[in-house]
Amino acid sequence: MQFFSTRDTNRKVTSSEAIAQGLSDEGGLFVPESFPQVDVRALCELDYPALAAAVIREYLTDYSPEFLAQAARTTYGEAFGGKAGYLAPVEGDTYALELWHGPTCAFKDYALQLMPRLLVEAKKNLGRTEKTLILVATSVDTGKAALDGYHDIPGVEIAVFYPTGGTSEIQRLQMATQEGANVAVYAVRGNFDDAQTGVKKVFGDKAIAAELEQRGIRLSSANSINWGRLVPQIVYYFAAYAQLLKAGKIAFGDAVDFCVPTGNFGDILAGYYAKRMGLPVGKLVCASNENNVLTDFLTTGTYTAKREFFKTTSPSMDILVSSNLERLLYHVTGSDTEVAGLMKSLAENGSYTVRPETLAAIQETFACGWSSEKEVAGEIRARYEQDGYLCDTHTAVAFHVAAQKKRSGVPMVVLSTASPFKFPRSVLEALGRTAPENDFEAMQQLEAATGHAAPASLAALRQKAERFDTVIDPAQIAEVALGYQA
């Protein structure tokens, strides 16, 4: 399997090169040359680690099947507490795919616990011995998951950049207390898009790349712009379908809809790949919060990033520049020239408009909707009081939109992307309680109010020492990168 850039299909690389490099030289994202067709029925018989290895090896063809099988078995074992890809019934034929049972209590663990192994193996495959410097812009959960996955990995340094004031206190402490000799964390003045733009500028700066290479350092990414982040997320769509099949809730071949809370479009794009591989995915419903740039685009065909930015209770979705949408645009248009033009317009004008036939093709698979802050709080309370199901703010966004887009007779799977205990104050307030200012006190009150236990890794943060408190401007991200030595 070869990969090429969304902006220049003449730039072809192997999967190892795509993962080691992260972003194409001209700024495009790597995509596979084709969608492998798989035996869905056979895959549905496998446990999660075996399923992961089987799906991933269809794309990572220069990795040995033995390596992928062992890596998947190691990754998705004890660290996920036996709940990798766990599907929970909620109400009727609506389900929650709980993706927060990993080490950092967010769906990013599915990719970022495996990805360090993929990177180390990629370097072996390519015969590379240089140090890898990973730069991560995060709306929060990616940062902690990347830090947890990459800490103390030999030959790797990782620096994470998150928007100051754009996280819950629990999320901030998850990053600020991270252990490891090779990790660094910076708060960036501004929002996620400011951090992401700063990191992308470093990746696109040939002078910085040349200077670092002279020191024996190569840049790479752990954001979902890296193919190694995206491919493990395809797996849990198959896992959800398999569980519905085994439970007798569907017959083989029946369509299942998925509603995904997303800002950067990576998690929902993984569902698109699953569909193109042959999984009977019906509609992929894109759920946004008040930063509803994706809802507007999927409705009108015009993407406008120049708009008011809202800090919401679902901060991982507080994004206005959605990177992975570029991959979908390439797959739908089939034109690197067209995609390059659209991305140029976005960079220069803050907007672009796709052709009507492109929008129509996208709407065949994708539906959309958004939730206000009031609706998010109401959804948390409704799900708990009516169904006994406790969810976080991001998942509540998706539940609200899923109810609007639910099709009669078609099961709806909502991707539950984070533990409710990562946002204890917001969840407690949504349940009609007065939340204390301290997140840990709120966590204890949420436990008492609901009878649910907070994940041990979150409760333990209270006793951990903070290591990182540096605040920088977006323009200083380049200085951070240039400060590294081999």
Which residue stretches match the model-derived regions?
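PLP-dependent amino-acid enzyme catalytic core
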Residues: M1-A486
